[in-house]
Amino acid sequence: DWQKALFKDNTMSYNANINISGGTKFVKYFASADYVHEGDLFRVYDNGRGYNSGYGYDRINVRSNLDFNITKTTVLKVNLAGSNAIRKAPWSNTGHSEWQIGQQWSGAYNIAPDVFLPQYSDGSWGMYPLVSNTTNSAENISLGGTMQVTTTRINTDFTLEQDLKFITKGLSARATVSWDNVFVENNRGINDLFNSAQHKWIDPDTGQERYEQSYDTNNGFDWTQGVNWSTSPGAVDNGQTVRNLYYQAQLNWVRSFGKHNVTAMGLFSRQENARGSVMPTYREDWAFRTTYNYADRYFIEYNGAYNGSEKFSPENRFAFFNSGAIGWMVSEEPFMKFFREKKIVDMLKVRASYGEIGSDQLGPDPFDSSRRWLYMNQWAYGGHTVMDLNHTESIYTWYRESAIGNKDIQWEVVKKLNIGIDYSFLEGLFAGSVEFFRDVRSNIFVYGGDRSIPSYFGGTPPSVNKGKIRTSGYELELRINKTFANDLRLWGNFSMTHARNKVLVKDDQALRPAYQKSAGHSVNQYTSYIDAGFIQSYDQLFGAPAHDANDSQKLVGDYYIVDFNGDGVV
C-alpha cells in the first residue's frame, strides 16, 4: 500500500504562546511570544548517507506594544514585532514547483502496489526498468539533500496622537511611521542532488534481482555507496530582501451642532518600497473627506484625493480624483414613526454615490524595469552591428535604444456609480440590501508588445493608454436571523451578483472584421468555429472550404466548419 508506505498515520503540530499586559498611568504595555511547529506527514527512510531529509516548519513570533501617555492630550504608541521562520524541505523540492511537488506524491496514486518496494533491506531503492516514468516517491523525499529556508521579518510602527481641542472642539491629529523589513536566506543545508543511488528490481516471474548499478564505472569494482554530498552555508536572497517605509499625517475634526453632525479629515501619506538592490518605488497621496448629516436622517459626503506615482512623467505624475455620496434614512422620517413603533421597519435607507478612482498598476511586478519607466526612452549597451553581406561583425559595441518611451502615459481612471437600498424589518428578522452599479474604466493601459502595430515598424512600439470598458450589474443580499425562546437560533445569508462587461474601445487592428475585434464584446470573450453538421460524403468534403492548417487531414465525418467571412478559407 503506497499510501501507508509514504505517509505516517499522524504527525505532530503544536502552538504555544505567552502574553503579558499591564501598565501604569504613564505607560500601558503588552508583550507576547508565540511558537509554531508543523511536523512532516511523509515517512522518511534511512538513506545511509548520514542525514535525514523530509519536511518541517518552525516559527517564532514576538510582539511588544507600548502606549505612553506623555501628556493628558498626547499619546505615543510604539509597536515592535518580529518573526523568524525556518522551513525544511528536500533540496530538490525547495523551489516548490508543481512538477517537483508532483514527484513527491505521484507514487501514492500512480504506482501499482506490487511493482516494487520503496526500499529493500540492503538499502537499495525500488525501481521498474520496463517503464521509464515510474517514480519512487520514497526515494525522491529521502535523497537529494535537505535545505533550510529562513525568513526573518521585522516590523516597527510608531504613532503619535494629539488631541487639539484647545484649538477647537473635536480636532485631533495623528502621525504614523512604519518601517518593515524582510530577509530570506536560501541554500543552507546539504546538497546531494546529483549523487547516484543504487536501484533494484526483482522479477516477479523468476525472482531474479536486477541492480541498476552493477559495478563502479570509475574502477570496475562492485558499486558501493559513498558520502559525496556537500554542505552549503546559505546566502541571503537579494531578490527577496524587502524594505518598506510608510509615513502618514492625518488631521481629524468631529463636531455636532444640535442636529447637525459634521466631520472632516485631511491626510498625507508617502510610501517607499525597495527590493534587493533595485531602486525604491515611490507613491504619494494627499486626501480629504467631509461628511454632514442632519439628525441621522439626511447624509452627504465628499471625498478627494491628489495621488502621485513615480511611474508617470512629471506632467502626468499627479492627478486629482474625487467622489460624492448622498443618503436618506427613510425610517427616521416622522411619517415612518408608526412602522418603527410597531417594529415593522427597523431601518430603511436609500443611498447613491458617484466618483473616480485612479490606478497606477502598469503590471504585476512594481519593480519590473520594462514597465516602470515607460514614459522615457531606455537605452542598452551590448551587441555588434553587421558590416557586410558576409555577416562580419563590427569591433565596436552598440549603445542602442532598447525601448521607446511615451511621456503621455498616465493614470487609469474608473468612474463608479452606485445606487442602493439598505433595509431591516421585523426586529432584524429580515435584513439586507439591493444595489445597482455601473463602472466605466477608461485610459486602460496597453503594453507596447500587445499593440496592433505592423511589423514593419521595426521594434516594440511605445505603450499607451488606449482602452475603455463598461461594467454594469446588480447585487442582492438577504440575511435572516431568528432567535427562539429556548435560545435556538436560526440564521442564513443569501446573496446574488449579476454583472456584465463590454469592451468599448480596444487597440484592434483597423481592417479586422468586426466579429474578430475585442471591441463590442465582453472582456476575454471566447471565440470558436461554427459548424454546420458533419461532412457526410466525399462530394461535400471536396466542396468544403479549405482549412488554413492541416487541410489534407480533413476527412468524411469531420465537422463542416462554416466559412464565416466567405473568403473560401477557414
Would you name each region that the model predicts?
Residues 1-45, 232-238, 253, 546-565:
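Residues embedded in well-ordered regular secondary structure
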Residues 30, 47, 54-63, 305, ...:
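Short, cationic motifs built from Arg/Lys/His that form the positively charged side of catalytic pockets
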Residues 38-81:
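Extended hydrophobic/aromatic segments used for targeting, binding, or gating
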Residues 87-100, 506-511:
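Low-complexity intrinsically disordered tracts that form flexible linkers/tails across taxa
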Residues 227, 502-570:
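C-terminal outer-membrane beta-barrel translocator/porin domains of Gram-negative envelope proteins
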